[in-house]
Amino acid sequence: GKTWSEPRLVTGFDEQTACLVRLPDNTILLVFGHKTDGSGQRFMASFDEGRSWSRTVYQLGQNCQYASTVLLTGNRLVSVSHRIIDGVGIFHARQWSAPKKTAFSDGGFWTPRPAEPLGVARSR
């Protein structure tokens, strides 16, 4: 965190609540919420410190938002997310493992373009 690169667009418009997780092999997973075609959690991977990201995007769960993910022992991950059903807030936890590096490579990689600010939100 001593230095930061220029901001870049990685996931696309209307993706939110991102969480970065570094695996023991130095793979970085970007877990994020999406609202572009429904809502849910997805993730993608970088094997070069975030310079490029997998074109392959994996669906983690649907109809859930605001997930946070942590690494457990044995390369297992747990994602906790929030969902509202009939006006009641419900938390979900999913334990999972990232696919092998070769599974990501099948979809290729892309280099994110610079991010452009969309505006400033203000609250009172």
Predicted regions and their residues:
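Asp-box/BNR beta-propeller blade signature and adjacent active/binding-site loops
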Residues: 1-124
